[in-house]
């Protein structure tokens, strides 16, 4: 399915059904309804040409894959394969798409298979990424972090080294997902792409969002089980939703309140996943923990309704659909079911979510999964270990340890986060 050579964008992009598009906007943490305008043609309008190319590419790639029969089994070559297209775009949608760009889809059959194992339909995947523009959640030193418009997918800018690391573990990762029937706390890797615009390459990884597409996260922790330099900076702490760390977790006497059965299931999954990472000599991963406070969310919802009511009185509404009303996209499944009450979620979409136990001090929902799993214990780590030992002494708790030690310390720390 490799396709290259010049091709006008109009042939792939303009033939699709009516689709809603929205300029990229930065999201507030509150659960405000996002509106998007239904349009006649997929024009991939985003405030950034790179995002437009990404949307065009995913749309093209999924359309191509749909034409190809699903292989009976994946072959070793599928883990090295890629499909690329070079586009010289003269006429179609040139106010949004650059006149020349290239799009590369890495290991398309493997990621298609992973999506299926994670219960994600290809057309829903396509709709979540292209029906409306993704928006930027944050921009850090290691690239941008975007969310699909319906908040079900994370679009992360990665480095070429990450792409190489991903290729190195992909067949092991796939095997692990097959073995555990997709029931994992690891990131759900759903697609990996290269976008080339103006002779510059950008690399993108698409994953399932570990947080909910509808329940706001009020507190967020990145936990590694190390106490050295593991406190959020003052600059971080003043953010609307700061990423807090191990020391903050301990200093706040934070606990996770779930019942014994839930804890047992979670720890079994975590142990299996950590064993897998240790085998591959991977380390420096974190447990991402998001906490949704049910009562606080209800109060915020009431405030939002009052605000909306005032806005509606002052301005006539455009004829738009609100996000979540579309039958397409990963969250579309919810629309055919009964509406969810406060603190309720659909487990097949919010796969990382766990409800607090009945005896918790307050009603909460926790989102917990493993992130940043690609760091290999290599020369770089050994060098960092030497430098830190010199600085802190041989017995100091330091983050850079051997993968076995890292995994053991990590599991011990996570076992103790529960009440």
UniProtKB/Swiss-Prot annotation:
Predominant location: endoplasmic reticulum
Gene Ontology molecular function terms on file: 1-phosphatidylinositol-4-phosphate 5-kinase activity; 1-phosphatidylinositol-5-phosphate 4-kinase activity; ATP binding
Positions of region (Disordered): 299-320
This enzyme's EC code(s): 2.7.1.149
Functional summary from the UniProt entry: Phosphatidylinositol 5-phosphate 4-kinase with low enzymatic activity. May be a GTP sensor, has higher GTP-dependent kinase activity than ATP-dependent kinase activity.
Composition-biased stretches (Acidic residues): 299-310
Post-translational modification: Phosphorylated, phosphorylation is induced by EGF.
GO terms (BP aspect): 1-phosphatidyl-1D-myo-inositol 4,5-bisphosphate biosynthetic process
Places the protein is found: Endoplasmic reticulum; Cytoplasm
Gene symbol of the encoding locus: pip4k2c
InterPro entries on file: PInositol-4-P-4/5-kinase_C_sf, PInositol-4-P-4/5-kinase_core, PInositol-4-P-5-kinase_N, PInositol-4/5-P-5/4-kinase
Record field: catalytic activity: a 1,2-diacyl-sn-glycero-3-phospho-(1D-myo-inositol-5-phosphate) + ATP = a 1,2-diacyl-sn-glycero-3-phospho-(1D-myo-inositol-4,5-bisphosphate) + ADP + H(+); 1,2-dihexadecanoyl-sn-glycero-3-phospho-(1D-myo-inositol-5-phosphate) + ATP = 1,2-dihexadecanoyl-sn-glycero-3-phospho-(1D-myo-inositol-4,5-bisphosphate) + ADP + H(+); 1,2-dihexadecanoyl-sn-glycero-3-phospho-(1D-myo-inositol-5-phosphate) + GTP = 1,2-dihexadecanoyl-sn-glycero-3-phospho-(1D-myo-inositol-4,5-bisphosphate) + GDP + H(+)
Annotated protein name in UniProt: Phosphatidylinositol 5-phosphate 4-kinase type-2 gamma
Keywords: ATP-binding, Cytoplasm, Endoplasmic reticulum, Kinase, Lipid metabolism, Nucleotide-binding, Transferase
Domain (PIPK): residue spans on this chain: 46-418
